Amino acid sequence: MVTIRADEISNIIRERIEQYNREVKIVNTGTVLQVGDGIARIHGLDEVMAGELVEFEEGTIGIALNLESNNVGVVLMGDGLMIQEGSSVKATGKIAQIPVSEAYLGRVINALAKPIDGWGEISASESRLIESPAPGIISRRSVYEPLQTGLIAIDSMIPIGRGQRELIFGDRQTGKTAVATDTILNQQGQNVICVYVAIGQKASSVAQVVTTFQERGAMEYTIVVAETADSPATLQYLAPYTGAALAEYFMYRERHTLIIYDDLSKQAQAYRQMSLLLRRPPGREAYPGDVFYLHSRLLERAAKSSSQLGEGSMTALPIVETQSGDVSAYIPTNVISITDGQIFLSADLFNAGIRPAINVGISVSRVGSAAQIKAMKQVAGKSKLELAQFAELEAFAQFASDLDKATQNQLARGQRLRELLKQSQSAPLTVAEQISTIYTGTNGYLDSLEIGQVRKFLVELRTYLKTNKPQFQEIISSTKTFTEEAETLLKDAIQDQMERFRLQEQL
């Protein structure tokens, strides 16, 4: 028979009493009233804050967006198919944040910063809020360094600086993504971290962009944030903020970053869907009243940091899709008014074979020549005006039967200038190559060539300069000015190449 020892029992009871935790844990909970279309209505959650994360019984996370008198409207970060009516929901006391680290470079992630490329987990010790306040006036300095896109039309006439926000907009299939991806390819060796945010696109389009980056070695310095067309509206709405948080992480570590939002029209549509399902009152084009704030708080996070903060920068290139070239629609005008300039891609120019299809008349950079090196200012200063005058003259010349010699010469020069701005996709040019190309056109060296020969001649000239006159590239890179020595080298190269080119054409 087992003997019961009173002292052992009393010791056990004493230990249990000492281990007893008198803390009371108060959890803010609620009950699901209804769920569907990515929206849940919750009764309870009395002390929940706007934008707070809530957790459902089966693990789905949501964001409390609508705080009404008798219920809370929550948008779901998932399909929510397992959420049942009457199940419990608890407030987490947190707002959306993501892990950040250098390990994200070269990876493809979703809006929650989870990898979707099948290469395993990403280690991160720090985290950043998805929505963080933009730098203030004192934290910034004016834009003064160029961010080279590698596209002659942009770098010479619509220059972009580090810390600038430049809108790229146009109809579908006009090469908006191509301009953005070419800019990323051109950052190779420039010590710029790139973030490409794909919002609501086809998975095949995103895969194509990622493949291009991998083939050209651009993934080494690029992070791709992707939420495809089949993702919940909540995640499409959050994706740009996730990209901005990652870019900010590098900016505040005194690095230069470039972020591309492709495209903000889809984000606005996702936000409109969420708002209408939450029964918020619709405004113009059925968008909610705060759709301007949706984009302004995102784009204001792009900045050029002050000297005290290490002069890091975050350059934003948002993309917006227009319908039938309507520049005055709601979202395009909103984003135009937020950004420091815009690049308009025209469907008519694209179909006419002018690619990149940049409409120089409507496009503008509000930073201007502050974002150009001195050499580019010296060579390309008048090219935008000349092209604008040519476009006007060309329209007029269609109605005139006989034109004087000066007008004919101006038209011929304009046609050749337009020809030298044409560029193949994924073929960015260095600054020295751009300067040599523009100088050749604006100084009349191409006037004697047929229009069809211009591009072939320029390609050969750039190759000739690289192999026979490497000093030209060195002078531009080191001094950043178009010196007399550089001009002499370039003139000699043009004359030598012109003679060789004419001999080749005669054979």
Curated annotation (Swiss-Prot):
Q: What is its main location?
A: plastid
Q: According to its UniProt entry, what is the function of this protein?
A: Produces ATP from ADP in the presence of a proton gradient across the membrane. The alpha chain is a regulatory subunit.
- Pfam families hit by this protein: ATP-synt_ab (PF00006), ATP-synt_ab_C (PF00306), ATP-synt_ab_N (PF02874)
Name recorded for this polypeptide: ATP synthase subunit alpha, chloroplastic
Where is this protein found?
Plastid, Chloroplast thylakoid membrane
Q: How does it assemble?
A: F-type ATPases have 2 components, CF(1) - the catalytic core - and CF(0) - the membrane proton channel. CF(1) has five subunits: alpha(3), beta(3), gamma(1), delta(1), epsilon(1). CF(0) has four main subunits: a, b, b' and c.
Question: Any keyword Nucleus?
Answer: no
Membrane-topology annotation of the record:
Peripheral membrane protein
Cite the position(s) of the site with description Required for activity: S363
Concerning PROSITE patterns, the annotation shows: ATPASE_ALPHA_BETA (PS00152)
CDD domains associated with the record: ATP-synt_F1_alpha_C, ATP-synt_F1_alpha_N, F1-ATPase_alpha_CD
* Source organism superkingdom: Eukaryota
The record's GO molecular-function terms, alphabetically, read: ADP binding; ATP binding; proton-transporting ATP synthase activity, rotational mechanism
Protein species of origin? Gossypium barbadense
Entry-linked HAMAP family: ATP_synth_alpha_bact (MF_01346)
E.C. no: 7.1.2.2
Family, according to the entry, reads as follows: Belongs to the ATPase alpha/beta chains family.
The record's section on InterPro entries has: ATP_synth_asu-like_sf, ATP_synth_asu_C, ATP_synth_asu_C_sf, ATP_synth_F1_a_nt-bd_dom, ATP_synth_F1_asu, ATPase_a/bsu_AS, ATPase_F1/V1/A1_a/bsu_N, ATPase_F1/V1/A1_a/bsu_N_sf
